[in-house]
Design a protein with these regions (language model features):
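Short acidic-glycine-tyrosine-enriched beta hairpin
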Residues: 59-94
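Ligand-binding loop in jelly-roll beta-barrel domains
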Residues: 83-88, 94-117
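A short, N-terminal "cap"/entry segment at the start of jelly-roll beta-barrel domains
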Residues: 1-40
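A short local loop/turn or secondary-structure capping micro-motif enriched for an aromatic residue
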Residues: 32, 62-65, 117
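Short hydrophobic/aromatic-rich beta-strand segments that constitute the beta-sheet cores
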Residues: 24, 54-56, 109-111
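Short histidine
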Residues: 31, 37, 67-68, 98
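Short, conserved beta-strand element in jelly-roll/cupin
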Residues: 39, 43-54, 58-59, 66-75
């Protein structure tokens, strides 16, 4: 199946096929996502424009399971801060706690959800 996407479209739509999903998102500062851990899904962040910080760690505590294998609202412990800008790509493996921060300007990002199975 063929489908064309443009990040210049006013309304970006997600694409989902089976367990594979592409999300097109725009955020304006200040923005702080909820912390999350995907037990069976890898994330790939592709920054189209703007800049952001991503907190990452294999170490976290607490949180709530919002659906099977998906944790939200955890406390990220011993995290590393990754600075991202236009053109950067970040692969976040399953079981890694993460949080996205936009501190100034705006961010347009493509997030690809890649199942482990």
């Amino acid at each position: 199946m063929y489908r064309r996407f443009s990040l210049n479209d006013e309304k970006l739509e997600d694409f989902k096929r089976g367990n594979f999903m592409i999300r097109f998102l725009r955020f304006n500062a200040p923005f702080k996502s909820e912390t999350e851990v995907h037990k069976k899904v890898n994330d790939m962040y592709i920054v189209y424009s703007g800049k952001a910080k991503v907190l990452l760690s294999d170490d976290y505590e607490g949180g709530r399971e919002v659906e099977p294998y998906e944790i939200r609202g955890c406390n990220i412990l011993n995290y590393e801060t990754i600075d991202m800008k236009s053109g950067d790509v970040l692969f976040i493996p399953a079981n890694t706690s993460h949080q996205l921060l936009v501190e100034e300007g705006s961010l347009t990002i493509v997030i690809i959800k890649i199942p482990e199975e």
